[in-house]
């Protein structure tokens, strides 16, 4: 199998690519964020390209390891007929970046283009609020050999885009999926709007094309549509070539030259790409690559990890942030940047655990109260009454009480049911308000029961 992707990503700008209309099309009533330029009305000339959009495109290209074009940048008219394209053509630039690489997949080119409107065939209406929103199209080489490789690439791309701050989010990403197998021609599946969808498309197309060849048929070069509700693809039309689009330079837009000094300024101010940060974390901090990928899943989380590592051991920090912190963030459905948990909070919690002021079990409960909380871990722990060292005598007394109050559990243990010990450990943790160490308590209970 050979798979290449054409990924369309909306850029994070306040205004459209060739006019000053706002870009908040998702929350606006239909056909309100429009002007004569958006609608390509006679006599309406486009503004010069939005500089913020061009800068965002350059930043993404740099973060994907692309060479920035030193050629003159033209905007071309790409002609095709569809209700969401009022002019009959789409403005798209020649490549801004070329020859990049991500996750072992070569990036052929990145260029800027305008989004068309939104056609609603069930109603026969078009909303032009989206028309003119700036996009980049990221075109890969056909380097992916399985649906899994394509899914991994897209996940990695999302991380890069999130780090860049240049994109409007995964929900605005659309991919055209190109797939062929040995002995067949290429099929293109248009406008797949999720990573899961791209994976399902490739799984379906792989089976469909193999079955055609197995029966002695011929796989057509065609454009197909993905029916998400049925998770299948269906024919749309025969695949177009570049000549079918009748590309010509747009006479209303002057050619552009990208200033190398401006590119260098963008390079100096952009964050370290996620995939490179992952590799550095492994080398610099000696942590596992899986942990590094979790910690670099958000730029702010990665920055927090580096701050925490200035105060505590990197592997200790990685374990707590990977397991406990990410668990709590996932449960609350928030990103680290939204949590109000600071690096100093994480350091304080780790120090409480390391000094045995709180047990791992108590810390498990404490961290659940930290998101959105302005109090320190120590203040939260004191309110929960889970901070403090329990003396051995107090633990022994709690063990004796748990055994005395639960004769059935004792009998179960004597009959070979080791899980009964876990129940008794839970009772001791309740009696000590979670201040006892579960592992040590488990060992002490077994020793006590074996003496009975």
Swiss-Prot record:
Record EC number: 6.3.5.-
Pfam families: GatB_N, GatB_Yqey
InterPro entries xref list: Asn/Gln-tRNA_amidoTrfase_suB/E, Asn/Gln-tRNA_Trfase_suB/E_cat, Asn/Gln_amidotransferase, Asn/Gln_tRNA_amidoTrase-B-like, GatB, GatB_C_1, GatB_Yqey_C_2, Gln-tRNA_amidoTrfase_suB_CS
Catalysed transformations (reactions): L-glutamyl-tRNA(Gln) + L-glutamine + ATP + H2O = L-glutaminyl-tRNA(Gln) + L-glutamate + ADP + phosphate + H(+); L-aspartyl-tRNA(Asn) + L-glutamine + ATP + H2O = L-asparaginyl-tRNA(Asn) + L-glutamate + ADP + phosphate + 2 H(+)
Recorded GO MF terms: asparaginyl-tRNA synthase (glutamine-hydrolyzing) activity; ATP binding; glutaminyl-tRNA synthase (glutamine-hydrolyzing) activity
Entry keywords, A to Z: ATP-binding, Ligase, Nucleotide-binding, Protein biosynthesis
Keyword ATP-binding: yes
Top EC class for this record: ligase
Gene Ontology biological process terms from the UniProt entry: glutaminyl-tRNAGln biosynthesis via transamidation; translation
Signal peptide: none
Keyword Nucleotide-binding: yes
Protein family (similarity comment): Belongs to the GatB/GatE family. GatB subfamily.
Subunit description: Heterotrimer of A, B and C subunits.
Record function comment: Allows the formation of correctly charged Asn-tRNA(Asn) or Gln-tRNA(Gln) through the transamidation of misacylated Asp-tRNA(Asn) or Glu-tRNA(Gln) in organisms which lack either or both of asparaginyl-tRNA or glutaminyl-tRNA synthetases. The reaction takes place in the presence of glutamine and ATP through an activated phospho-Asp-tRNA(Asn) or phospho-Glu-tRNA(Gln).
Name the UniProt record assigns to this protein: Aspartyl/glutamyl-tRNA(Asn/Gln) amidotransferase subunit B
Native source species: Methanosphaera stadtmanae (strain ATCC 43021 / DSM 3091 / JCM 11832 / MCB-3)
Lineage: Archaea, Methanobacteriati, Methanobacteriota, Methanomada group, Methanobacteria
């Amino acid at each position: 199998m050979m798979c290449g992707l054409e990924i369309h990503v909306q850029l994070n700008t306040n205004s459209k690519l060739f006019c000053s209309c706002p870009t908040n099309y998702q929350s606006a009533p239909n056909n309100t964020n429009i002007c004569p330029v958006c609608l390509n009305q006679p006599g309406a000339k486009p503004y010069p390209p939005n500089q913020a959009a061009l800068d965002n495109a350059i930043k993404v290209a740099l973060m994907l390891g692309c060479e920035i074009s030193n050629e003159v940048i033209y905007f071309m008219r790409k002609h095709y007929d569809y209700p969401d394209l009022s002019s009959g053509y789409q403005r798209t630039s020649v490549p801004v970046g070329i020859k990049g690489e991500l996750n072992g997949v070569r990036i052929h080119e990145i260029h800027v283009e305008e989004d068309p409107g939104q056609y609603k065939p069930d109603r026969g209406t078009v909303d032009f609020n989206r028309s003119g929103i700036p996009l980049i199209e990221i075109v890969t080489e056909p380097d992916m050999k399985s649906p899994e490789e394509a899914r991994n690439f897209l996940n990695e791309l999302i991380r890069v885009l999130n780090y860049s701050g240049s994109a409007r989010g995964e929900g605005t990403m659309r991919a055209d999926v190109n797939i062929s197998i040995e002995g067949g021609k290429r099929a293109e599946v248009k406008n797949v709007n999720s990573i899961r969808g791209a994976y399902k498309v490739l799984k379906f197309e792989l089976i469909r094309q193999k079955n055609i060849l197995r029966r002695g048929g011929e796989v057509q070069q065609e454009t197909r549509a993905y029916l998400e509700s049925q998770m299948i693809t269906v024919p749309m039309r025969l695949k177009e070539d570049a000549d079918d689009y009748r590309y010509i330079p747009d006479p209303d837009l002057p050619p552009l030259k990208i200033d190398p000094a401006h590119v260098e300024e963008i390079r100096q101010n952009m964050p370290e790409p996620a995939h490179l940060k992952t590799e550095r974390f492994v080398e610099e901090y000696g942590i596992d690559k899986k942990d590094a990928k979790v910690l670099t899943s958000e730029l702010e989380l990665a920055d927090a990890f580096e701050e925490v590592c200035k105060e505590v051991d990197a592997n200790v920090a990685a374990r707590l942030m990977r397991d406990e912190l990410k668990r709590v963030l996932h449960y609350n459905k928030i990103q680290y940047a939204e949590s109000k948990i600071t690096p100093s909070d994480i350091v304080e919690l780790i120090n409480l655990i390391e000094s045995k002021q709180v047990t791992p079990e108590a810390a498990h409960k404490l961290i659940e109260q930290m998101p959105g909380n302005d109090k320190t871990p120590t203040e939260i722990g004191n309110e929960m009454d889970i901070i403090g060292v329990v003396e051995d005598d107090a633990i022994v007394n709690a063990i004796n009480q748990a055994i005395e109050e639960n004769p059935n559990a004792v009998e179960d243990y004597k009959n070979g049911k080791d899980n009964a010990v876990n129940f008794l450990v839970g009772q001791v943790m309740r009696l000590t308000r979670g201040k006892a160490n579960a592992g040590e308590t488990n060992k002490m209970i077994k020793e006590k029961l074996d003496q009975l």
